[in-house]
Swiss-Prot record:
Cofactor: [2Fe-2S] cluster; Mg(2+)
Official protein name in the record: Dihydroxy-acid dehydratase
Binding annotation for Mg(2+): 87, 129-130, 452
Family statement: Belongs to the IlvD/Edd family.
Residue ranges that the Swiss-Prot or TrEMBL entry lists as coiled coil: none
Domain of life of the native organism: Bacteria
Length: 564
């Protein structure tokens, strides 16, 4: 990509230059600006710091470091806030329905502030799951030079010689309910699982999306697997600010970086690292914001040619900090590049291509570690996020299929209209091996907000039923989920999807080998059940949930709000 040097304040000049803008400049003077500052670029800092969650409570120091570096590099830092929801805290409650909504609110905040204030560039600092897709969607809509600074991963907790993370606690609840763990051990795991700041430590949603941002080239190399408490994270934030100022000078914008080829790169890295099912939903939305043609079937295309190289939780053994020590995302990317599974000509925020960024990275992982496998000895020959279709999900749904002893099951439906009743049935011992749980009316419109469900899946794992009980839903799963689970079923129940017409005891087949999700009744029987069906009344009639339910597209299109 050829870059050209431009006036670095060309956007902000709209509100700072000329006699008619004297009132505007007066307001800047009130904040300590000098006349010379108006020739400098106005750089937004979208600060996701919050004391709501440890994922974001360590962000202020990164924002401060970036602000200082922006000023030192000749820019004016303009700080504004973006909200967050703690998925880990909201999980299993009505609050979880606000998680996906927050993705849209974050993107709206960034687009609104950047465009409303004529900013010349923006640096986004985020931590918890929806901060990443929401941040990038806002960056793409505004389409000014931009970079994402990830808050960093959390360090592991420890108990009885084992590493712990937030998923350990959810699974411990299930073990305790099944009589396999004492109350004292549950309490100790609860207290020790999260020792400090940073995002949840496995290849869960936050680390999945931040790793994908490295692969896109919208974040700096190695930044996604750094731990929040470590000094290198501060240094990375400073370097991100310096790189952004250069991108403003060269006019490198998000839509130059986020293309179909770079999304393929990101999805290849998601597959290679064993990332979260949520990445499917979020990259459909990111592609929409970028104006890139990308469908749910493209994930399956990339999956079939990309091996799983990393032995990472939830279905593997290690955490993001271990991946960092083993060479980080650049090592994984270099292996994929050498194997012809990555596009090396994609541009990054630094102005370098992916191939140039990876030039000095070894072709193969170092010996003596088991986090990153050699390309010819992968964890699995194909990716783990499979797109299933069938009469229960003609638009597609997402299953995490690696690590399962038997990726095929047929069993009787156990139908629940909400998450809480399904969780109670598990904890009360009413779900048995061979059952297929159906949790419905939890999609983008029906939830509304398409809540994640780590509590039921964690309870199944803890009860020893993770591979013997199936669970399908039009809602989502946490990045920490594993087992025989299928989410994002589309069309959703609230839109009249066939998941709405499953009856208790119906036979359901989940077949990851054949990429099939099937309700085993005749077409005639299925059609007869639809007679007289009407959509349920909205659960919310005012506020953000009502707006989300009214506007949200299908999960197969990313559950976006502007698919008009």
């Amino acid at each position: 990509m050829e870059t050209k040097v431009i006036a670095i304040n060309r956007r902000s000049a709209n509100i700072t230059e000329g006699k008619s803008r004297a009132p505007n400049r007066s307001m800047y003077y009130a904040m300590g600006y000098e006349e010379s500052d108006f020739k400098k670029p106005m750089i937004g800092v979208a600060n996701g710091h919050s004391t709501i969650t440890p994922c974001n409570s360590g962000l202020q120091k990164l924002a401060d470091a970036a602000i200082d570096a922006i000023e030192e590099a000749g820019g004016n830092a303009q700080v504004f806030g973006t909200p967050t929801i703690s998925d880990g805290m909201a999980m299993g409650t009505e609050g979880m329905k606000y998680s996906l909504v927050s993705r849209e609110v974050i993107s709206d905040c960034i687009e609104t502030c950047v465009q409303g204030q004529w900013m010349d560039g923006v640096l986004v600092v985020g931590g918890c799951d929806k901060n990443m897709p929401g941040g990038l969607m806002g960056m793409l809509r505004a389409n000014v030079p931009a970079i994402f600074v990830y808050g960093g991963t959390i360090l592991p907790g420890h108990y009885q010689g084992k590493d712990l993370n937030i998923v350990s606690v959810f699974e411990a609840v299930g073990e305790n309910a099944a009589g396999r763990m004492s109350d004292e051990d549950l309490l100790q795991i609860e207290r020790r699982a999260i020792p400090g700041t940073g995002s949840c430590g496995g290849m869960y949603t936050a680390n999945t999306m931040s790793s994908a941002f490295e692969a896109l080239g919208i974040s700096l190399p190695y930044s996604s697997t750094m731990a929040n408490p470590h000094d290198e994270k501060l240094n990375s934030a400073k370097e991100s600010a310096r790189v952004l100022i250069e991108a403003v000078k060269k006019d490198i914008k998000p839509r130059d970086i986020v293309t179909k080829k770079s999304i393929e790169n990101a999805v290849a890295v998601i597959m290679a690292t064993g990332g979260s099912t949520n990445a499917v939903l979020h990259f459909l939305a990111i592609a929409h914001a970028a104006g890139v043609e990308w469908t749910i079937d493209d994930f399956e295309r990339v999956r079939q040619k990309t091996p799983v190289l990393c032995n990472l939780k939830p279905s593997g053994q290690y955490l993001a900090v271990d991946l960092h020590q083993a060479g980080g995302i650049p090592q994984v990317m270099k292996m994929l590049l050498v194997a012809g599974l990555l596009h090396g000509d994609c541009i990054t925020i630094s102005g370098q291509t992916i191939a140039e960024v990876l030039a000095d990275v070894p072709d193969a992982p170092r010996a003596g570690q088991d986090v990153i496998r050699p390309i010819d000895q992968p964890m699995y020959a194909q990716g783990h996020l499979a797109i299933l279709k069938g009469n229960l999900s003609p638009e597609g749904c997402v299953a995490k299929i690696t690590g399962l002893k038997n990726p095929v099951m047929t069993g009787p439906a156990r139908v629940f209209e909400d998450e809480q009743s399904g969780l109670k049935a598990i904890l009360d011992g009413k779900i048995v091996a061979g059952d297929v749980m159906v949790l419905r009316y939890l999609g983008p419109k029906g939830g509304p907000g398409m809540p994640e469900m780590l509590a039921p899946t964690g309870a199944l794992i803890g009860a020893g039923l993770g591979e013997s009980v199936g669970l399908i839903t039009d809602g989502r799963f946490s990045g920490g989920t594993w087992g025989m689970v299928v989410g994002h079923v589309a069309p959703e129940a609230a839109a009249g999807g066939n998941i709405a017409f499953i009856e208790e005891g119906d036979s359901i087949t989940i077949d990851a080998n054949q990429l099939l999700l099937q309700l085993n009744i005749s077409d005639a029987e299925l059609e007869s059940r639809k007679v007289g069906w009407t959509a349920p009344a909205p659960r919310y009639t005012r506020g953000v949930q009502a707006k989300f339910a009214f506007n949200a597209s299908s999960a197969s299109k990313g559950a976006v709000l502007d698919d008009y």
